From Swiss-Prot:
Coiled-coil stretches noted in the UniProt entry, renumbered to this chain: none
GO MF, one annotated term: rRNA binding
Entry keyword set: Chloroplast, Plastid, Ribonucleoprotein, Ribosomal protein, RNA-binding, rRNA-binding
One family name in Pfam for this protein: Ribosomal_L23
Family matches, as PANTHER family: 60S RIBOSOMAL PROTEIN L23A (PTHR11620)
GO annotation, cellular component aspect: chloroplast; ribonucleoprotein complex; ribosome
Protein name, per record: Large ribosomal subunit protein uL23c
InterPro entries on file: Nucleotide-bd_a/b_plait_sf, Ribosomal_uL23-like, Ribosomal_uL23/eL15/eS24_sf, Ribosomal_uL23_CS
Principal subcellular localisation of the protein: plastid
Lineage: Eukaryota, Viridiplantae, Streptophyta, Embryophyta, Marchantiophyta
Length: 91
């Protein structure tokens, strides 16, 4: 399933990690229930809540052509206490 693109690591999301909340950029067509089921199956965790918002598109200019960046939806996923998601492997 290619709904979840990648985890997001910013100052805000690092603060949210302390509250057992994880942030992911997902496909714009995904909805909360799809992402909740996918996270629970893939990472074997219990999801309490899922919050989402759409990121604004940004203007990109290449030469004389003007376009826009690819839009994603950002999901903030809150897990039940005792569960965690390993964002990076220890290899």
């Amino acid at each position: 399933m290619n709904q979840v693109k990648y985890p997001v690591l910013t100052e805000k999301t690092i603060r949210l990690l302390e509250k057992n909340q994880y942030s992911f950029d997902v496909n714009i067509d995904s909805n909360k229930t799809q992402i909740k089921k996918w996270i629970e199956l893939f990472f074997n965790v219990k999801v309490i809540s899922v919050n989402s918002h759409r990121l604004p598109k940004k203007k990109k200019k290449i030469g004389t052509t003007t376009g826009y960046t690819v839009r994603y939806k950002r999901m903030i996923i809150k897990l039940q206490s005792g569960y965690s998601i390993p964002l990076f492997s220890n290899k």
